């Protein structure tokens, strides 16, 4: 069985945004030599996410609005107990929990085996600093 690991470094200038990382994931799969297997992609930070959806700007705007309604940004310690530690990103932890940590995509004939419109996205909820994404490809 083959195993290939690579990392992306994300540095999103906005506090919350979504970045299509499908091309980088496809490149990692191609470089792995795996023809049949699995590709794990996960955010390696507790205020970031990796998820699969459509690359449609209106949908991304809807997500941002919806997430902000669920867990509004509020740096004060009143809303989020986490902010009582001196942090100001309690909302970002909640947003990550909703959007998830990772995705696993089948690799078939050396390519990501997506359904229609599916793309891999990095979700940033407390941006303006470097964070890593792990890409792990395993298989034959």
Per-range role (PLM):
Residues 1-140:
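Active-site histidine-anchored catalytic micro-motif
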